[in-house]
From Swiss-Prot:
The lineage of its organism: Bacteria, Bacillati, Bacillota, Bacilli, Lactobacillales. It comes from Streptococcus sanguinis (strain SK36). This is DNA-directed RNA polymerase subunit omega. It is an enzyme of class 2 (transferase). One of its GO terms (molecular function) is DNA binding. Its EC number is 2.7.7.6. Promotes RNA polymerase assembly. Latches the N- and C-terminal regions of the beta' subunit thereby facilitating its interaction with the beta and alpha subunits. It catalyses: RNA(n) + a ribonucleoside 5'-triphosphate = RNA(n+1) + diphosphate. GO terms for cellular component: DNA-directed RNA polymerase complex. Residues 60-104 are annotated as: Disordered. Belongs to the RNA polymerase subunit omega family. PANTHER family: DNA-DIRECTED RNA POLYMERASE SUBUNIT OMEGA.
Length: 104
């Protein structure tokens, strides 16, 4: 049975097979917890989805701990801004519906 993505392709993306296992496990946990996907998947299982993301280069190991912290901060800020925008749109919709209701 041939595994997709292949182990050889994946090992080109990370320094060692141990790093690959850790990266795959962490990303699979993130996906299970509801983290946004970086691409469309062929696989159903989160572990295989994580490997697909690693193969495509969308998920990488940060050799620099500060770089990882910055990426986490940036992701948290993007999520905060997305939620604020969503709340703003909901409030606008409520105000619009309320205004239309008062006109009747």
């Amino acid at each position: 049975m041939m595994l997709k993505p292949s182990i050889d392709t994946l090992l080109d993306k990370v320094p060692s097979k141990y790093s690959l296992v850790i990266l795959e496990a962490k990303r699979a946990h993130e996906l299970e917890a509801g983290a946004p996907a970086t691409q469309e998947f062929k696989s159903v299982k989160s572990t295989l989805r994580a490997l697909e993301e690693i193969e495509s280069g969308n998920v990488v190991i940060h050799p620099d701990p500060e770089g990882k912290r910055e990426a986490v901060r940036r992701r948290a800020e993007e999520e905060r801004l997305r939620k604020e925008e969503e709340e703003r749109k909901i409030k606008e919709q409520i105000a619009k519906e309320k205004e239309e209701g008062e006109k009747i």
